[in-house]
């Protein structure tokens, strides 16, 4: 089977720096696996890698869509698999576990675009209460379904599927890999992670996080703002909360998401856990990948 390497972990764990180093060492290419970074304009708030930071390493699925365009997990699965087939050694880098697993395992996803009608043609944007209702319904009626509750389009799609002849969890998801996968999970103590998150957030504000959110709101009023960081800044701009409250919410939700993220990867994929603060981080990950590739056509 084709060998694929995954570099994942929470925000502020150093995925970008490590992936650039490893992709250079093994002559690989990087496939963005962060669902937000697929979209243009969400740069500061998603800590999107800059062109200069890419250091001539080929990156795929970055800045692919406008903020108000629909790009589903089905689209990612299709595009990612196509890239994998054409790349010598693909590195999937990001923290969107559902996206990563959909591309690497034999998930059968449908190409349904009905949610785009709800969001664009009708000019309808569901509010928080609507989202919470649909999430409760999905969990009650299809408790085995793994879905991204932070993405409203996917919540709506899963909710609409509740009325189909077969539950989505029963008909679409399987758990067999279609590639030979090595997953490196960058782990970090929660207190150190929180300090990093706070530091990064302050840096984002200095870089213009508020101005970026305001610009997206003005140019794409029907864009997805159900994203940690952008959602809270939007509330601040609407004068529903103050800046201190916005920052506290962003930090709290980021930490909660990181906790759930780790649990998800531990339960859903076989991972090699590496401590971010290990002084030999790059040496160890290099050796793990070298052993993984031993005997393959990459040597």
Swiss-Prot record:
Identify which cofactors the protein needs according to its UniProt entry. Answer: Mg(2+)
Q: Which UniProt keywords apply?
A: ATP-binding, Magnesium, Nucleotide-binding, Transferase, tRNA processing
Q: Where is this site: Interaction with substrate tRNA?
A: 96
Q: What is its EC number?
A: 2.5.1.75
Q: Which domain of life is it from?
A: Bacteria
Pfam hit, one: IPPT
Q: Where do the record's region annotations for Interaction with substrate tRNA lie?
A: 34-37
Q: How does it assemble?
A: Monomer.
Entry-linked PANTHER family: TRNA DIMETHYLALLYLTRANSFERASE
Q: Which family does it belong to?
A: Belongs to the IPP transferase family.
Summary of the function given for this chain in its UniProt record = Catalyzes the transfer of a dimethylallyl group onto the adenine at position 37 in tRNAs that read codons beginning with uridine, leading to the formation of N6-(dimethylallyl)adenosine (i(6)A).
Protein name per the record? tRNA dimethylallyltransferase
Q: Which organism is it from?
A: Phytoplasma mali (strain AT)
């Amino acid at each position: 089977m084709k060998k694929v390497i995954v570099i994942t972990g929470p925000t502020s764990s150093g995925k970008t720096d490590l992936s650039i180093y490893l992709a250079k060492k093994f002559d690989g290419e990087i496939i963005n696996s962060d669902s937000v970074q697929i979209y243009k304009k969400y740069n500061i708030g998603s800590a999107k890698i800059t062109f200069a930071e890419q250091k001539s390493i080929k990156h795929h699925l970055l800045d692919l869509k406008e903020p108000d365009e629909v790009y589903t997990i089905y689209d990612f699965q299709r595009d990612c698999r196509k890239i994998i087939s054409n790349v010598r050694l693909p590195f999937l880098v990001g923290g969107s576990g559902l996206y990563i697993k959909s591309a690497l395992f034999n998930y059968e996803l449908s190409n349904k675009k009905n949610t785009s009608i709800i969001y664009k043609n009708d000019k309808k944007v569901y509010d928080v209460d609507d989202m919470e209702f649909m999430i409760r319904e999905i969990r009650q009626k299809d408790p085995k379904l793994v879905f991204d509750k932070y993405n409203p389009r996917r919540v709506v799609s899963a909710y609409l599927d509740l009325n189909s002849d077969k539950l989505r969890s029963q008909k679409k998801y399987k758990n067999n890999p279609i590639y030979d996968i090595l997953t490196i999970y960058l782990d970090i103590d929660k207190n150190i992670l929180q300090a990093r998150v706070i530091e990064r957030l302050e840096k984002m504000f200095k870089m213009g996080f508020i101005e970026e959110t305001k610009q997206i709101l003005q140019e794409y009023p029907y864009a997805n703002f159900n994203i940690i960081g952008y959602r809270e800044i939007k509330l601040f701009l609407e004068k529903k909360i103050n800046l201190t409250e916005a920052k506290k919410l962003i930090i709290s939700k980021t930490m909660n998401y990181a906790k759930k993220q780790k649990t998800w990867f531990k339960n859903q994929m076989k991972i090699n856990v590496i401590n971010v603060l290990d002084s030999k981080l790059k040496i160890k990950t290099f050796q793990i990948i070298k052993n993984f590739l031993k005997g393959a056509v990459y040597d």
